[in-house]
Structure formats: C-alpha cells, structure tokens
Amino acid sequence: MASPAAGGVVIVGSGLIGRSWAMLFASGGFKVKLYDIEQQQITDALENIRKEMKSLEQSGSLKGSLSAERQLSLISGCGNLAEAVEGAVHIQECVPENLELKKKIFAQLDRIVDDRVILSSSSSCLLPSKLFSGLAHVKQCIVAHPVNPPYYVPLVELVPHPETAPATMDRTYALMKKIGQSPVRVLKEIDGFVLNRLQYAVISEAWRLVEEEIVSPSDLDLVMSDGLGMRYAFIGPLETMHLNAEGVISYCERYSEGMKHVLSTFGPVPEFSGATVERVSEDMCMKVPDDPEHLAARRQWRDDCLMKLSILKYQMQPK
C-alpha cells in the first residue's frame, strides 16, 4: 500500500473512465480526489464506485490487497480544482474527447500546479503536441491512454510530448505498474498511437472482406474471437511469428514472400458507408439488438468475460 508520503492522485472528470481510474488508484493504496464541475455528478460517481467495488469484492474480483471499504475510504469528491490538486503527485484528466475542452482543462491546471506533479491525459487519439504545447509545465505532461474498460484490461499507452521529460515517462510507467496496469512506452507521438493503429488495420481489412462478400459479418467476428483473438490474448503478433517457426529470422525466410503477396492485394481505406453499413448492422443486431437494454447486458457480459480472462492470464504467467 502506498504511504501518505507518496502523495495523492486527482481524477478530473467522473465519467466511466474517470471512475475506473479512481478504482485502480485506490486499489494501489493511493488517496484519490475525484473532481467534477457538477456536485451531483460527483455524488453519482461515488455511489457507482461503491456499488461496483462491493460487487467485485463479492465475486472475488476486487483488485489490490485492501478491502472494498478501505479502498472506498481512499476516494473522495471535490468540486474545487485548486483544492483538489493540492499535494497531488499525479493528475489524470478524463473529460470527453474534445481537444478544446481538454486544452482548457490543462491550461487551468498549468496555472495552479507545482513543478513536481505529473499532468496526464486519458486521450485515445489526441496528440500530445496538440494537447500540451505552450504549457509552462509541458515537461511534466504525458498521455496515459487506457483501454476500455480499464479495470479489466490493463494496457496503458504512455505517449510523450516532444518536450516531455524522461523522468515524467519513468515515473508514470512506475505508477502504472504499481497499480497493476501494463504500461507500454510509445517512443514518439503518432496518429492513433499504437493500439488504435493495430485495431483500425484489423477493422479496415475486416470491412473489405465483408464488403467484397468474402465472408459474412458474423463469421468474420468468429475468425477473431475463436481464432486470432485466442492466441493474441496471451502472445502478440511478433511472438506468434517467433513461435510459428524456429524464431523470427526463420519465419521471415519462410513466409515473407507469401505475406507480401497477400498484403499487395489489400485495397484502399474503406468508406464505412452505404450498403455494407446496413449489412453489418443487420447482422450485429440479429446477435445483439441495438437498444440500450440489450447493449448494456452484452457489455456487462463482455466485462465479465474480460474479468475472468484477466484472472486466467495472471494464473498462466510464464515461469
């Protein structure tokens, strides 16, 4: 458990991502202040966190070594930003994905923080150079992009501004490890970071295969969930290459020409419109109707699966 000397953490924004971050930091023993401009949103968020933590404790899925009550005691709400950030060592911004809104928040923070606190954004796609340029504390700024839902999916992409101090990256990396996340260092900024670039590449080819009537939407998803996805839940594409031959060099010697031939047949970026949208939507809605009730139930099932998978991954760590 983190000692009081370790300082506190501030979450700016009390939506789903903000609540998830609050729970994660509390699981690591950190005192957390949840800031929002609306007191009712803070009240609702704290109640949501209480229910979620109690449910996790009952199912044996609560993170960390502290009880739910102890973790909950570490989380408080605050409607005054200056008061919230006093004594903080890490501030995690979690407002909606709007560049001007995020820049406004960081400009406010820039005026009131000291030279030690880390200013971190949860942005999934906004480049650090767009978010942080011009700030007096730019060396302390970094993007820490979580994967939804962060409590069950541990990856966090750490993306620096060109002026981010190496110590900021190192401290953020250590902090993410301390609360049980799996941080990766993105060495320089790039559109989409790493996760979304990989995700969009898969979505793009998946869309083309459906659009060209190579495979149905439901069978396409099955290729991932019962094929590639099962493997990738434990090892990545590069280790897959390594294991599917006698190492990476052997794999490239054997399969590079075949890979290049297939890759040369890939088409342009899809438009994601027209008849294919209707076809994919119809197929998905047969499986999960797109009304709020069915979508919420399916998301809960997804989260339950991810929770159990995270337990299995922990149990199956290589020796």
UniProtKB/Swiss-Prot annotation:
Q: Which Gene Ontology cellular component terms are annotated? A: cytosol
The way its activity is modulated is described as: Inhibited by malonate.
* Any Pfam family hit: 3HCDH
What is the annotated localization of this protein? Answer: Cytoplasm
Asked whether the UniProt record includes Ribonucleoprotein among its keywords, one would answer no
Record bears the keyword Kinase: no
Spell out the reaction equation it catalyses.
L-gulonate + NAD(+) = 3-dehydro-L-gulonate + NADH + H(+)
Example GO BP: fatty acid metabolic process
Q: What is this protein called?
A: Lambda-crystallin homolog
In which organism is this protein found?
A: Mus musculus (Mouse)
